[in-house]
Amino acid sequence: MDVNPTLLFLKVPAQNAISTTFPYTGDPPYSHGTGTGYTMDTVNRTHQYSEKGKWTTNTETGAPQLNPIDGPLPEDNEPSGYAQTDCVLEAMAFLEESHPGIFENSCLETMEVVQQTRVDKLTQGRQTYDWTLNRNQPAATALANTIEVFRSNGLTANESGRLIDFLKDVMDSMDKEEMEITTHFQRKRRVRDNMTKKMVTQRTIGKKKQRLNKKGYLIRALTLNTMTKDAERGKLKRRAIATPGMQIRGFVYFVETLARSICEKLEQSGLPVGGNEKKAKLANVVRKMMTNSQDTELSFTITGDNTKWNENQNPRMFLAMITYITRNQPEWFRNVLSIAPIMFSNKMARLGKGYMFESKSMKLRTQIPAEMLANIDLKYFNESTRKKIEKIRPLLIDGTASLSPGMMMGMFNMLSTVLGVSILNLGQKRYTKTTYWWDGLQSSDDFALIVNAPNHEGIQAGVDRFYRTCKLVGINMSKKKSYINRTGTFEFTSFFYRYGFVANFSMELPSFGVSGINESADMSIGVTVIKNNMINNDLGPATAQMALQLFIKDYRYTYRCHRGDTQIQTRRSFELKKLWDQTRSKAGLLVSDGGPNLYNIRNLHIPEVCLKWELMDEDYQGRLCNPLNPFVSHKEIESINNAVVMPAHGPAKSMEYDAVATTHSWIPKRNRSILNTSQRGILEDEQMYQKCCNLFEKFFPSSSYRRPVGISSMVEAMVSRARIDARIDFESGRIKKEEFSEIMKICCTIEELRRQK
């Protein structure tokens, strides 16, 4: 039977058809090889946008620096970073005038945060540049290494556990004439294997002490490591992103806390809220503009795109903003907040791994590390790479490039949003002093501009004025990529607005399916995704029911756990049939044990174990929830876990799901091959730190403590806690005298060992 596709849309309003335009099936592209070329592109482009600025040399590091601020005025059409300080300050002043007390209140909120934040805040976040090893590491390890090095160099303010005290150490470290660090290295030896009599390569991991002079240390402290951004759809070229080191992170965190607090109070800001809350906030602004444009006014909306937002931003502008925002605050607070932009004005971009060369004739491959790019003969490179290297050479120091202008991706999202909103704020009639006026939405580099005026000429004049005002603070609206429409239809941060925000359900499609973590988590994530889409994305009941059935089918095929009474033969079917036959209450079996599916769209919020608990045989309950099961290495039991789900557009989202720990919540073991590489020493450090943390949590069962940082302080805490507990237990008769003295002896031994070390 032929179906006429137009029939499908007879009852559907046009805006709902957006889900049928979904282009993103299949996997997104990932980057391979090094990001060195992309990073050089970024550095060269950033300097090109500011090329008419003034060159100076940093007295400490000798790095050449370009300062475009308060230089030439920007030109029409060409993107540039020529911001004017007085324009930025004036925009800030007007923002404060239309929001009385906003800066004052945000400063007070931030001051409280600054005094209360613990160092362990910095353990959040994924890969971080670890300056001690000069490469990326998980955040917790990078922090532990930094603190360990600080302490061995006599910087101990961090022992209080407050982030602000750790930052005091960072400041002191920059005044030191030298810093001593421990690095990992590996030796390779060719030895004969006794068994096979063949020659094999033996690797040994060593640690060695290394001294960094002031210049060397400062360069590392100011370095942002770069990587290639993965999984970007709809782009032909990859681009570089940056990960700052621990010295910068803490300062950035406080600046962003202040900016976040300001953004929360600005109705035009699309940050820091998300999802439905964001849609509601933005819909308000649109409603305001539409109701105000009575019959006499026209209203148009620009779906905006800025050219190279962060390469034209300038840390010096951010410094000016912070200086203004905090102008009546205590000196210490102003100093803490101004350090991040100052560090960014002096930042160095690490060029990554370097280039890989291969000779087809000799079947040889060799890596040219970034450090060698400064003086290698350029005849080996192709034309475009040669140009890049020639351009970047004057900026190179030790494999890093001096990059004073520009912000690198994703660093000051909140603060740059404040800057954007301050220009939107200037669109009020009392500031434009003419018949046109504007308002809009800003979320990091994405914006939507709504202009109202009595006629088309007025609209054009308003857009022009907005465009030029933006230029003066280093924001470059792209005329090529922005488009204008009657208000009521526009796109902003991948939300499509047509008389209200349209649910674009197809964006969520990639996150449906089986995640592949383990049987327990996958079931939970799968039903949670369906539940969330019913709440947020207009997923109707019939479609949801179908999605659920497809998910269960997918799940059973993934884990080969078809129902016990099925005819499908898999590797597991023999065992599952046996279980099915000996189970009295078959409804109680989990789907992953060949049980039936009891989920429907009404009970998606209940974890499967809870849903079936009353239906389970007693011995099945005992096997399922058995922490002593030797075949399962358990995660610590938490009621809520976080999964990373990939929407089609935008960053991977973190999604909470209920985690009931059972024998199905297994964790796959770590790949062995890492143990033969130079990472091994680092891995061992990480495992030791992890073990120490786990032990620490056994000692302090209350949830009130915050995990301390660095191994040494934990050991002290545990020893003193052990002594106190032992004394209490001994005096109340819970332990014998022999046990008590043995505990005391162990504590003394530990302290003795620490003294010798």
Swiss-Prot record:
Q: Gene3D superfamilies given for it?
A: 6.10.140.720
Q: Where is the composition biased (Polar residues)?
A: 55-64
Q: Where in the cell is it found?
A: Host nucleus; Host cytoplasm
User: Can you give the residue ranges of the RdRp catalytic domain?
Assistant: 286-483
Task: Report motif location: Nuclear localization signal.
Answer: 187-195, 203-216
Q: Where is this region: Disordered?
A: 50-82
Q: What does this gene product do?
A: RNA-dependent RNA polymerase which is responsible for replication and transcription of virus RNA segments. The transcription of viral mRNAs occurs by a unique mechanism called cap-snatching. 5' methylated caps of cellular mRNAs are cleaved after 10-13 nucleotides by PA. In turn, these short capped RNAs are used as primers by PB1 for transcription of viral mRNAs. During virus replication, PB1 initiates RNA synthesis and copy vRNA into complementary RNA (cRNA) which in turn serves as a template for the production of more vRNAs.
Name this polypeptide is given: RNA-directed RNA polymerase catalytic subunit
Q: What is the lineage of its organism?
A: Viruses, Riboviria, Orthornavirae, Negarnaviricota, Polyploviricotina
